[in-house]
């Protein structure tokens, strides 16, 4: 059976220097190739929402990105503001420092505060798996399952590494067959996307969506 790669893809542009023209191009590509969503920083949500109005492509906004180390109240506020501006999905970054400090209750409360402000808007929780042990990955995945979030997500693409097959498999095994798993960071070609899907990913975050659906090799510097 042929994989419909486009339906897996969150077409992504999160660079600090991304221009409005580049965001508009991202949205045009997403409409042309029927990607599931575009993923942008919250400041570009109004632009993306306007460009994608009337299309099937959803607008996803990152929150607390890329460090996840801001105040919980600020993350929750940003999520609500992004939704009010037109975001239809939210990708938040956990506070990795808190997790590594053993502040498990604070990490969970941080996620819950954002989830509560998302209401019916799907929330994806970014673990930054390259910085975590397997035990910590399982710990956060179990936390997210308990909080009934929509997805767990591997990476910001801004740290020391991106999605790895073994981490996606571990995340899928932990959350079970229903909850979403998003592989992001360093997924730049069709073969890698297929590996992640076979490992259990139900969404792919990438700046190389066009290359993936066309079977080409993207630039090595992409998200």
Swiss-Prot record:
Coiled coil: none annotated. SUPFAM superfamilies: Aldolase (SSF51569). It catalyses: 2-deoxy-D-ribose 5-phosphate = D-glyceraldehyde 3-phosphate + acetaldehyde. It is an enzyme of class 4 (lyase). GO terms for biological process: 2-deoxyribose 1-phosphate catabolic process; carbohydrate catabolic process; deoxyribonucleotide catabolic process. SMART domains: DeoC. InterPro entries: Aldolase_TIM (IPR013785), DeoC (IPR011343), DeoC/FbaB/LacD_aldolase (IPR002915), DeoC_typeI (IPR028581). The active site is at 91 (proton donor/acceptor), 153 (schiff-base intermediate with acetaldehyde), 182 (proton donor/acceptor). Keywords: Cytoplasm, Lyase, Schiff base. It comes from the Bacteria. Pathway: Carbohydrate degradation; 2-deoxy-D-ribose 1-phosphate degradation; D-glyceraldehyde 3-phosphate and acetaldehyde from 2-deoxy-alpha-D-ribose 1-phosphate: step 2/2. GO terms for molecular function: deoxyribose-phosphate aldolase activity. It is found in: Cytoplasm. Its EC number is 4.1.2.4. GO terms for cellular component: cytoplasm. Catalyzes a reversible aldol reaction between acetaldehyde and D-glyceraldehyde 3-phosphate to generate 2-deoxy-D-ribose 5-phosphate. Belongs to the DeoC/FbaB aldolase family. DeoC type 1 subfamily. This is Deoxyribose-phosphate aldolase 1. It comes from Yersinia pestis. The gene is deoC1.
């Amino acid at each position: 059976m042929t994989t419909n790669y486009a339906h897996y893809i969150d077409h992504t542009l999160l660079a600090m220097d991304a221009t409005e023209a580049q965001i508009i191009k991202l949205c045009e590509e997403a409409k042309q190739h029927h990607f599931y969503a575009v993923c942008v920083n919250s400041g570009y949500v109004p632009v993306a929402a306007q460009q994608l109005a009337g299309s099937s492509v959803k607008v996803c906004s990152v929150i607390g990105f890329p460090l996840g180390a801001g105040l919980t109240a600020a993350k929750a506020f940003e999520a609500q503001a992004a939704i009010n501006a037109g975001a239809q999905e939210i990708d938040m970054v956990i506070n990795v420092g808190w997790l590594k400090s053993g502040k498990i209750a604070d990490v969970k409360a941080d996620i819950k505060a954002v989830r509560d402000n998302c209401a019916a808007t799907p929330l994806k929780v970014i673990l930054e798996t390259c910085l975590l042990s397997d035990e910590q990955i399982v710990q956060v995945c179990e936390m997210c399952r308990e909080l009934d979030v929509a997805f767990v997500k591997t990476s910001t693409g801004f740290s020391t590494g991106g999605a790895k097959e073994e981490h996606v498999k571990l995340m899928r095994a932990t959350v079970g067959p229903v909850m979403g798993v998003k592989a992001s960071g360093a997924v730049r070609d069709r073969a890698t996307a297929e590996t992640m899907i076979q490992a259990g990913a139900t969404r792919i975050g990438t700046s190389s969506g066009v290359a993936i659906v066309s079977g080409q090799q993207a630039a090595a510097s992409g998200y």
